[in-house]
């Protein structure tokens, strides 16, 4: 029989009492009052912060956006089909953040930085807030390096610099995404990390872009953030900020980044949907009053950092869709006023077979020639003026029955200049090829050729110059200037190729 020793029991109880730590844990909890349309109204959560993540009983995450006197309006980052009225919600004490790092290169992810390309998990130890403050004035420096798009019309007349925000605007089906993807393809070998953000697009369109980038070897340095048309409005609204956080990671690591938002009209529509469901007062075109801030805080994150911070850069190319060419609508005017210029794509030019369909007359870069190398500045200086004069004369020529010889020559020159701006999709040109093309057109070497032969001649001239005059490329690459030697080499190549081309054409006619 076991004897019970009272002193032993007393010692054990005393020991336990001494070890007892009375810790009171207060949880910031609430109860679901109403749920539907990816919006939940919560009673409680008295100490929740604006933008704080909240977690529902069944695991769905939401963001507290509306802090009202008697309830909290939460937008859901999922369908929320299992959330019931009366179920509990707890505040997490965290603001939305995502993992970032080199491992994301070449991957397709969603707004929560989860992979959606079926290639397994992405491991990363670094994190960045989705909503981060833009660099201040002291943290920036003026833009001075060009970001080459590979498109003659842009690089010569609407130059983009590293750290700039340049809007691509136009109606649907005018080639906005094509301009953006061509720019990504042209960054190959330029040590630029690209982030492509697809907002509210068809899954097939996103897949097409990814396939194009893979075929051209551009996915190696590109991250695709995609929230398709069937995604909740909350995730479509967050996707651009996720892309910006990823690009910022590389920018602050002293690297150069390019981010494309395709497109911000759909993000604004998703935000409008959320705001109306949260019963926020509607303003112009039913958008909420802070829709300008929605885009300004996103686009201000693009910057060219100061030398103290490593001179990294983040160049933003936001895309905005217009209706029937109306650039005076609410979202287009907002984004135009935030950005450092716009590239306007025209339906009429697109239908006339001028692609990329860039309307040079109303497109502008507010950084200008600061984002061009000296060689391009020297050669392309007159191009925009000549095209503007040609457009004016062409409009007049429709009504005039007979024109003098000078006007006829100017029209012929203008038509050839317009022809040399045409480019096939996914066929970007190097700076040397662009300078060669513009110089040939501006100096009248193409005037004697029939209009239909211009592109053929330029392609052959480009091949001839690469093969027989490699020194031309070397001079431009090393000095970035259009020296007398480079000009002499180019003139010689044009003369040689013109003779060969005309002989060849004559032989074909005779045959």
Swiss-Prot record:
It catalyses: ATP + H2O + 4 H(+)(in) = ADP + phosphate + 5 H(+)(out). Signal peptide: none annotated. Keywords: ATP synthesis, ATP-binding, CF(1), Hydrogen ion transport, Ion transport, Membrane, Nucleotide-binding, Plastid, Translocase, Transport. The record marks 363 as: Required for activity. GO terms for cellular component: plastid membrane; proton-transporting ATP synthase complex. Its EC number is 7.1.2.2. F-type ATPases have 2 components, CF(1) - the catalytic core - and CF(0) - the membrane proton channel. CF(1) has five subunits: alpha(3), beta(3), gamma(1), delta(1), epsilon(1). CF(0) has four main subunits: a, b, b' and c. Produces ATP from ADP in the presence of a proton gradient across the membrane. The alpha chain is a regulatory subunit. This is ATP synthase subunit alpha, plastid. It comes from Cuscuta reflexa (Southern Asian dodder).
């Amino acid at each position: 029989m076991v004897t019970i020793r009272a002193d032993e029991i007393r010692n054990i109880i005393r020991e336990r009492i001494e070890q007892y730590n009375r810790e009171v844990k207060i949880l910031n909890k609430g109860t679901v009052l109403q749920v539907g349309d990816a919006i939940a109204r919560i009673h409680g959560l008295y100490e929740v912060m604006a933008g704080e993540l909240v977690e529902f009983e069944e695991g769905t995450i939401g963001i507290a956006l509306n802090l009202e006197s008697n309830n909290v309006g939460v937008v859901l980052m999922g369908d929320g089909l299992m959330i019931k009225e009366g179920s509990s919600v707890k505040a997490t004490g965290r603001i939305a953040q995502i993992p970032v790092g080199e491992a994301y290169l070449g991957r397709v992810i969603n707004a929560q930085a989860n992979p959606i390309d079926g290639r397994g998990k992405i491991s990363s130890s670094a994190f960045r807030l989705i909503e981060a403050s833009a660099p201040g004035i002291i943290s920036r420096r003026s833009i001075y390096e060009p970001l080459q798009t590979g498109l003659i019309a842009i690089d010569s007349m609407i130059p983009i610099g590293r750290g700039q925000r340049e809007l691509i605007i136009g109606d649907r089906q005018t080639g906005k995404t094509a301009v953006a993807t061509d720019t990504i393809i042209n960054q190959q070998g330029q040590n630029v990390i690209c982030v492509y953000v697809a907002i509210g697009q068809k899954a097939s369109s996103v897949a097409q872009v990814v396939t194009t980038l893979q075929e051209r070897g551009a996915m190696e340095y590109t991250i695709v953030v995609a929230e398709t048309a069937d995604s909740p409005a909350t995730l479509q609204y967050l996707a651009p900020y996720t892309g910006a956080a990823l690009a910022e990671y590389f920018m602050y690591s002293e690297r150069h980044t390019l981010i494309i938002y395709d497109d911000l009209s759909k993000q604004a529509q998703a935000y409008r949907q959320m705001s109306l469901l949260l019963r926020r007062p509607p303003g112009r075109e039913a958008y909420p009053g802070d829709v300008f801030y929605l885009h300004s805080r996103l686009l201000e994150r693009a910057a060219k950092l100061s030398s103290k911070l490593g001179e990294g850069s983040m160049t933003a190319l936001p895309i905005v869709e217009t209706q029937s060419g109306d650039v005076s609508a609410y979202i287009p005017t907002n984004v135009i006023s935030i950005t450092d210029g716009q590239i306007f794509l025209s339906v009429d030019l697109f239908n006339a077979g001028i692609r990329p369909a860039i309307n040079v007359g109303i497109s502008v870069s507010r950084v200008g020639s600061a984002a061009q190398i000296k060689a391009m500045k020297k050669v392309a200086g007159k191009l925009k003026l000549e095209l503007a004069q040609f457009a004016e004369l062409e409009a007049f020529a429709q009504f005039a029955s007979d024109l003098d010889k000078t006007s006829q020559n100017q029209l012929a020159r203008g038509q050839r200049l317009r022809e040399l701006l045409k480019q096939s999709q996914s066929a970007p040109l190097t700076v040397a090829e662009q300078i060669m093309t513009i110089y040939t057109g501006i100096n009248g070497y193409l005037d004697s050729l029939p209009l239909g032969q211009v592109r053929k001649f330029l392609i052959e001239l480009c091949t001839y110059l690469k093969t027989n005059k490699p020194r031309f490329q070397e001079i431009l690459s090393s000095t970035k200037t259009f020296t007398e030697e480079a000009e002499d080499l180019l003139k010689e190549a044009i003369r040689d190729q013109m003779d060969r081309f005309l002989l060849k054409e004559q032989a074909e006619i005779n045959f």
